[in-house]
Every structure is written in C-alpha cells, then in structure tokens.
Amino acid sequence: MEKIKVALVSLGCDKNRIDSELMLYKLNEEAELVKNPKEAQVIIVNTCGFIETAKEESINTILQMASYKKTHNCKVLVVTGCLTQRYKGELKELIPEMDIMLGVNDYDKLLESIKVFLKSGEKSFYHKYSDTKINEGNRILTTPTYTAYVRIAEGCNNFCTYCAIPRIRGKYRSRKKENILKEVENLAKQGVKEIILIAQDTTMYGIDIYGKKVLHELLRDISKVEGVKWIRLLYCYPEEITKELIEEIKNNDKVCKYLDLPIQQISNSVLKRMGRKTTKETIINIIKKLRKEIEGITLRTSLIVGFPGETEGEFSELKEFVSDVKLDKLGVFKYSKEEGTSAALMEEQIDEEIKEKREEEIMILQQSISKDINKEKIGKIYEVIVEGIKEDMYYGRNYEMSPEIDGEIYFEKDENVRIGDIIKVKVTHSLEYDLIGVVYNELSK
C-alpha cells in the first residue's frame, strides 16, 4: 500500500483504546497516520456498543465520517469494534457506505482488506467470534508519553443480567505473564512512568491459565521493571480481592493506593436481579478491610440507578450506603436497556425521568462528600505527575486520581517543571473534585 493517509477515530473505553493503538501500529509502516479525519483517504471508526448512548455516538460518528466521502478526501470507510461485533447484520444494511467491517477479533485482516478495496473496490465484512484469541502486540500510544494502559485479560465470565460484554468479547482469558512484562518493559523504555492495568475484571487475572488468581504476583513483577513509577489498578471486583492482593498493594511502593471497585448497586435484592455474585455485606466488609489494612487508600466505584424493579426503598438503601461509606470517588450511570440481555426482558422497567432524578440525587450527595474529603487534604504533600497547562497553571494527578475520570491538582507554573515529571505539590486549597497547591521544595516548607 502506498503511503495513503489514514485516520482512526476511537470511541468507548480504555480497552477499546488499546485495540485502536494495536491497529495504528499495524498501519504505521505502510500508511501516513493523520489526526484529522478530513485529511484522510482511509477513515477507521473503532466503535463502542456497550450502552444505548454509546451506540448512538458510534452510529452518528460513522455517518459523519461517511459524509467525508462527498465533502473531503475519504475513499475507504472502515468500521470495527464492539458495535460491529454485536450488530454485524443490521449495520451492513443500515450503513451501506461502509466499505470494510471488522469484528473485535479481526484486526489482523485490517491492512489486507484496505489494500484489496483500494485495488479492486471489493468490500470486506468480517465478524469472527472467539473465546480464545487475545489482541496483543506492539502499539502506537494515544495516551500522553508518561502513561499507558495495559490490558491483562480479555472477555468476561460474569454474565451480569444487564451487560452484553461476554457476548461481544467472549469468555475471560488472561494474557501470559511474560507477554505482559515484555510489553511493560517496552513501554518503560519509551518513557512511560504510569502503568494502568485493565480488564473486564482485573482481580480474576490468572485464574484460567495458572489455576489461581495471581494479580498480586503480576504487580510484584511489574514493579521490578526499571522506569515504572506508578502501577494503577482499575476494574477490581470486590468479592474477588484476595488477602495476597491487599498485602501487595499495602507493601509495594510502586502500586498506587487506589482501587476502582465497580459495585454497581448495594441492595441485595437488586444485586440478585443483576446477577452479581456478591452481597451488600461482602461489599461493605471488603471496603472496611481495605481501609483498615491500607493506609490512605482511595476507593472509587460506579453505580447504576434505575435498574428494572428498583423501588424507592432500594434506592434509599443505595443513598444511605453512599452517605455512610463515603467513597472517595464515585460515578453514576442510568440503567440502559440492552438487547440480548435478560434485564431487558424484566418487568417494571423504570421511567427515564425517574432514572435522571435518581442519578442527580446520588451525584449531589457525592459532590458534598467529595468536597469534605478534599478539605481534609489541605496541607498535605503529594507526588504529582505533571500533565499540562490550563489558564497559566500547571495541572497533574496524584495517586488518588485516575486519568480522565477523577479530579486534578492545579499549581502555579515553575520553570523547573516539565510535563511528565513527577514532583511534590503541597495542597493549599480544595474544590469539590479538584485541588490547588504549590510546588513543594525546601523554600516552600
């Protein structure tokens, strides 16, 4: 393929981002990668098909990119990702402007499909389902140079009643430890300091290939890689957290004292309808244990409101939990009715207006909690990774803050500070979600 201009639009989660980065690497040698789709002759849209709003965004983006065939330079429109895997037949009929359609297990066919279409105009439509394949290899990072996501497993075995991911991504399958370590070593050589481990469920890592959960061992091995400063864990199911994992987080200085626990709900009756393999008591006990064992740990969660049949009593129970437990970070999502899931067939679907009201109530409550938590940080000194400049101030994150979903720490410019540096900042003021501080050194004590 001649050096044709290619642009990739990546939608959805961090796991999708990794797939996009893998595709970019495959294309890089034979194509010129451009950021602006209006300049590209080949446009790739990596879609998300998880919830209704994500599907709408994906379809709107595909249609917008398709319009560039008439208004700009686009000759080939490639669509891939979870939406194509989930709605392969429907999409082909709905959007005839697509020239190539690939499922989540077909990225190895990307380059050849583009070549074939450019040569002959022959369209390609692949959507292989796989319970064994794992997309891995070299990537071109789309994150800042100092941070990178590393996927440690693919798929999911949980089959929650509201979620279509197992039907899209297949069963849970861990990557080999040596492959992950090789990837981390390569990333560290490129200057990456923060490694963010992701999967549909990171806490189950190793169960399928090693016969036991070995996330704690993986953390220990990654921490030995030269250049790695922070290791961050996302998507940790509370019921799968082991004592070994707690000990490793507690004692390993490179592992951020931060855990993302996607609990979704707290009422036992709702958890049961969701198909979650846990209980209110288990969730509360693990939160207490984490706080007792790991000093300064930050806990984040995501909640779903408006699940089918959610009563005022069940919602009040959720509000009471949020108020009493006071998690450091919290996101709320309205339940989305997904085709092919058993929850979509449940009776007593909740009105959208009620979902929105409940979402707002939780977020107002959490905003107050977050404001109080942040006030307690005034006077404290944190290591901060510098991310950029906004309105004449630097901003960055400490160990309590995951990229894009949590707050930031702002501080005045310092001529000795560069983006990507890890420096010390003393907190002087607090907001609901963000902190303000000064660079901490001998003179600012």
From Swiss-Prot:
A GO BP entry: tRNA modification
Domain of life assignment: Bacteria
Radical SAM core domain sequence ranges: 142-372
One GO location term (cellular component): cytosol
Family annotation (Pfam families): Radical_SAM, TRAM_2, UPF0004
Chain positions recorded as [4Fe-4S] cluster 1 binding sites: C13, C48, C82
Any one GO MF annotation of this record: metal ion binding
Keyword annotations: 4Fe-4S, Cytoplasm, Iron, Iron-sulfur, Metal-binding, S-adenosyl-L-methionine, Transferase
EC number: 2.8.4.4
Task performed by this protein: Catalyzes the methylthiolation of an aspartic acid residue of ribosomal protein uS12.
Protein name, UniProt field: Ribosomal protein uS12 methylthiotransferase RimO
